[in-house]
Amino acid sequence: MPADMKVLHEREFSEVWLRDYTDEPYFRIYHTLEKVEATNLDEYRVETAVVSDIPRIVRIINDSYANISVTCDQIREYTKTEVYQPALWIKAVHCANGKIVGCGMADFDSEMQEGIIEWIQVLPEYRGKKIGQMLVNELLLRMKPMARFATVSGQVNNLSSPEKLYRKCGFVGNDIWHILTKKT
């Protein structure tokens, strides 16, 4: 971790830190995997993503965020990690035209038996159609045979309110972490 950063749990955090640091709070919530239901949508289907989908996945990620930009090389590097599981990289495909309109990427930590949702993206023009919910629930169903539980984290102040999506899919908890960056 860079010397100008600190990560504090909510229990350790106080407003005093804000004199010298900027704060970006993140939620971290979990799912027991006991009750997971598929979200079936007539117009969209889920498929396992393959390495040749990476350029399209990168476009979806970059088109979904104003402040994040990833490259194909960065995403390919994820496939070389110990927690990479090919079955946990999925895409939402429009049935009528075959267009990839969303994607989901998750990891599996075999030591902890934990499924970790890393990315859920839906192109802005396709949001509000339950595609995100379909992707999250599909990942949870795929994790269920291998994991004891699943986790996800995200920015508390994200304008797209990802925490609401995850809670609709059965995630619970109230863990908040603060990423503090030294003011210059």
Predicted regions and their residues:
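Acyl-donor-binding surface of acyltransferase catalytic domains
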Residues: 1-42, 178-182
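A short beta-loop-alpha structural element at the N-terminal edge
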Residues: 44-59
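Hydrophobic adenine-recognition pocket in adenosine-nucleotide-binding enzymes
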Residues: 49, 120-122, 155-156
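A conserved beta-strand-loop-helix scaffold within acyl/acetyltransferase catalytic domains
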Residues: 67-122
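Conserved acetyl-CoA-binding loop-helix of GNAT-fold acetyltransferases
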Residues: 122, 128-144, 163-168
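Short glycine/proline-centered loop/turn elements that form peptide/ligand docking sites
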Residues: 136, 158-162, 181-183
